[in-house]
């Protein structure tokens, strides 16, 4: 290996170490709650990641009506040629519906769980959707190319990110200038939303966390029955 390549590799690992160290310094810790990790970011306990064993719940027949997922998908700010990323794609409930909306575009289905990745790849083949690419991410990065996506969306996922600071920094680099990030999160403010507390978020908390990482709220949609529709735009290109 050439010296120049070694230097580039060395610089990469140094920058990765620095980013991870900065990420870790952003958190405090407490005794974990029943559904939390004990890791706290800006006053919010980070929730445990939902195992892919819960795939049946993701694909339940009642979901379309309960969450009005048709309205959620049609409300995405995308065009027929948009490039988007479904972060924490799970079973691909949203991935494959969005892919049908952008026949000239592309959907990156990003997951960290191997079972989910296998499921997504199999379903993409079965549905013959060539514009879906499954990506194995990590807890600190979606592993997407720089300046590659117009929109990233997370459906009931952001609150589970183990390293939100590092992850958002990496995701910001993957977004094109003016790129947007959409969070769908169960409404913490509404006690009628029967979801465990650690798996809900308030608008105030989401705004605080995203603002701290270079994103501003540009739309607060209140049209979904159970979830916030929070569209952010990155403020630094």
Task: Annotate each predicted stretch with a short phrase.
Residues 80-90:
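Conserved class I S-adenosyl-L-methionine
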Residues 91-103:
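Conserved SAM-binding loop of SAM-dependent methyltransferases across substrates and taxa
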Residues 127-139:
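Conserved SAM-binding strand-loop segment of SAM-dependent methyltransferases
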Residues 142-151:
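A short acidic, Gly/Pro-enriched loop at the edge of an enzyme's catalytic core
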Residues 165-180:
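A short glycine-rich, Lys/Arg-flanked "PGG" loop and its adjoining helix->strand segment in the class I
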């Amino acid at each position: 290996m050439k010296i120049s390549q070694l230097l580039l590799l060395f610089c990469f690992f140094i920058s990765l170490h620095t980013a991870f160290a900065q990420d870790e310094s952003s958190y405090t810790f407490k005794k974990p709650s029943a559904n939390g990790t004990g890791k706290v970011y800006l006053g919010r306990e980070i929730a445990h990641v939902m195992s892919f064993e819960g795939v049946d719940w993701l694909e339940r027949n009642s979901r379309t009506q309960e969450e009005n997922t048709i309205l959620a998908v049609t409300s995405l700010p995308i065009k027929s040629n948009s490039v988007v990323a479904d972060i924490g794609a799970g079973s691909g409930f949203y991935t494959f519906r969005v892919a049908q909306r952008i026949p000239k575009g592309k959907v990156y289905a990003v997951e960290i769980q191997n079972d989910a990745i296998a499921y997504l790849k199999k379903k993409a083949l079965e549905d013959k959707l060539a514009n879906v690419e499954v990506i194995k991410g990590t807890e600190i990065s979606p592993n997407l190319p720089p300046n590659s996506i117009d929109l990233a969306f997370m459906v009931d996922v952001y609150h589970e990110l183990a390293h939100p600071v590092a992850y958002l920094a990496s995701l910001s680099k993957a977004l094109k200038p003016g790129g947007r990030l959409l969070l769908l999160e169960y409404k913490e403010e509404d006690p009628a939303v029967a979801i465990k507390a650690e798996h809900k978020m308030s608008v105030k908390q989401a705004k605080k966390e995203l603002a701290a990482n270079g994103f501003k709220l540009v739309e607060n949609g209140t049209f979904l029955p159970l979830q916030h529709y929070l569209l952010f735009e990155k403020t630094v290109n």
